[in-house]
Amino acid sequence: MRTDTPQAVNLADYRPFPFAIETTRLVFDLHPTRTRVSAELSVRRTGGKNEPLVLNGERLKLVSIAIDGRPLAAGEYGVDAERLTIAEAPDAFVLTTEVEIDPSSNKALMGLYMSGGRFCTQCEAEGFRTITYFPDRPDVLSRYSVRIEADGKFPHLLSNGNPVASGSLDGGRHFAEWSDPFPKPSYLFALVAGDLDVLADKFITMSGREVALRVFVDPGQASRAAYALDSLKRAMKWDEEAFGREYDLDLFMIVAVRDFNFGAMENKGLNIFNSSLLLADPQTATDLDYERIEAVVAHEYFHNWTGNRITCRDWFQLCLKEGFTVFRDQGLSADMRGAAVQRIKDVRALRARQFAEDAGPLAHPVRPSSYLKIDNFYTATIYEKGAEIIRMLKAILGAPAFRKGCDLYFQRHDGEATTVEAFIACFAEASGRDLSGFFGWYEQAGTPSVTIETAYDAAAGALTLTLTQSTSPTPGQPDKKPLPIPIAIGLLAADGRVLRDTEIVLLDQAQMTVRWDSIPEPPVLSALRGFSAPVNLSTDARPSDRYVLFGSDTDLFNRWEAGQTLARDLILTRAAGAPDEVGEERYADALGRALVDDAAEPAFKALLLALPSEPDLALMFEAADPAALHAARDHLRTRIAVHLGDLLRRLHGEMQINGEFSSDAAAAGRRALRNACAEALSADPHAENLARLLGHFGAARNMTDMIGGLYPMVAMGGVPREKALESFHHAWRTEPLVLDKWFAVQGRDPNPDALERVIALTQHPDFEPTNPNRLRALVSTFANFNPARFHDPSGAGYAFLADEILKVDAFNPMTAARLVEPLGGWRRYKPELGDLMRAQLERIVAHPNLSKNVLELASKALG
Ligand code: ARG
Ligand code: ZN
């Protein structure tokens, strides 16, 4: 048994920090193994007379400490593994500390570490405390000035704010000084030092100020940063137009690093990115990479207002910046790439990640009230469901009142660290609405289930809708209350004509009825249009109603949704042993008609052609059997490939683009549809299709087509798989981002020998477990996206994942913890599997020296 039970942090225990840190002066003397950091904090007491000054600090070697220049004697302060305490601090003073740290041994990639021979930092959420002693909490805002000294081998010395001085020093060393005029919390501090190439540009803001833009990348990679730089300019413009937000410093910098625990980080004026979300050219990046780069560059830039100018009072308020900022980046993507297609992709991701989380032992409210490690709460719930809540707020208030609320928030809370309550209060005030019930969305975990029953009275020409909602219990929340759910509803006639336009019905009780008159004929219900709320909807619709929606709903989201629901029901029925052959034919016919609709965009058709994923299907199942689902889904794939073979081959040919590559949404849509056709045809691998697929892979001139061709080759197994993987590896062995794709495609390999091969790949010379991208490409792809092989009846897939978690936890707890989730759903699987999953969680929890990160998630998963 472990004796050191970690302490939970509770929202209810929030207390302001009893001191203000008005200015923070940092001097870095950089050295790979012995970096000196001296900090000069001007401290002023704001709380009670007897409050001690307690600063966070971990893994620091304290070299000296002084108050107002006077070194402290041993009895005047205390240091332990997590903090520095000065019991009797004056009311106003300057505290100077000097510490030594070792960036090169830092494989947790938090704080100051080295990547590719360069220094870089990641401080959110609690990394700053491994750099210097400081109140490392988001509500302590300070003005920073930074001096960096380093060897000439590190030519670029970067930090937040504006550059104020630079020059050379003795012994081949040099320095740079930076000053950030905006008070900020420590988690937004950043430093980068090293040899980098830079791509430069400028942006003129709406008030006419010129901002210098710089993107720093590995030497030789500057051309690959052009798309990110262009995305940045579009994001800056969009934020001015959509939210009236202007950039505030004279300089905005982005740096790409290869070793990074997550996507990117919004440090003030100096964003740091995982290189996988920054570098792109047609040869090495897929359209999905381009799409994500556009979204993440925007996301981090948007944080400058939603996160940096207005930050979080404490980490329980994380959704205040993350949910709002995801909402904002989704808005940009919708404007750049088409609202319907973007919405479908966002909802697909929401269901795959957030609905799964909300349905399992790791379910938590968008604003949680307790945690062990805040790093475990950078979840789909905080981010994606957090964004859905803002989207509902906008739907309920209407766009003008929503914008007024945003303006009020920006004006009232600028320069503050605030709360979700304060944010919602701005919308209540701006709209004059009572939003107290709405707040339940932040406090209640779980995905609500909504049912709608319809009764049509032909004589009266009236339709009665009976709407009900309920939410199942989640850990720690046995009883759920009704939430205000905006449900966008329209009506179609049986022949697809519009009978009634979209209207938002606000379901804010457990049950309510709505009566609509003047409905001249029996209607087909199109409910939850645009996925107007993050709920599971069930209605009394018959398959024939769904075919009406699939064929003609004006709401493209619901058109897609109808197709998915039809396919899902057919797969689940077959997996349960009662196949509906006639229904499968009918579905394939309707899909064929949708694919030849000239009015629909290729990107939309590509989405229609993608069947519901296996993990999504498993969510719909009690006691899920991944093998049966895989087989049933494959059966429908084959049925479609056979039934629509001619059409799919024709489209595959027509969508081919000859001529120059364009990364725009229209061209990407054509490539997506062509790849979807290839994927579909691979389910019927006769000679003609095989030749076509080989041609697709062999002739690919960009990475989107290449990956679209590689997966079917891998899925075929045998000689095509070996040959394709070998030629791909040979071509790309020196490009880390492309090699990640090579590992990922093998993580998704559906062949029966995939697990064995994945385990063997962990011994491949190119497998670098200390690099999170490489690790996730193989291990996380396998565990999350290859259910048929991960859920091997022997339990070997689970044991493999547990082995990897324990190995990685020894040096990078944060990345290890993110691998726990696939085991967390054990209760949803059939008991033979669930028991084996649980056994691996028990093995993990029993492991000595487990990190708090993994301990928290694995023990919660055991429930
Ligand atoms: N704030 C960053 C973003 O969303 C992510 C930081 C993740 N930090 C963490 N400890 N998981 O853009
Ligand atoms: Zn963010």
From Swiss-Prot:
One of its GO terms (biological process) is proteolysis. It is an enzyme of class 3 (hydrolase). It holds the Pfam family DUF3458. Gene3D superfamilies: 2.60.40.1840, 3.30.2010.30, Neutral Protease Domain 2 (1.10.390.10), Peptidase M1, alanyl aminopeptidase, C-terminal domain (1.25.50.10), tricorn interacting facor f3 domain (2.60.40.1730). The record marks 383 as: Transition state stabilizer. It catalyses: Release of an N-terminal amino acid, Xaa-|-Yaa- from a peptide, amide or arylamide. Xaa is preferably Ala, but may be most amino acids including Pro (slow action). When a terminal hydrophobic residue is followed by a prolyl residue, the two may be released as an intact Xaa-Pro dipeptide. This is Aminopeptidase N. The gene is pepN.
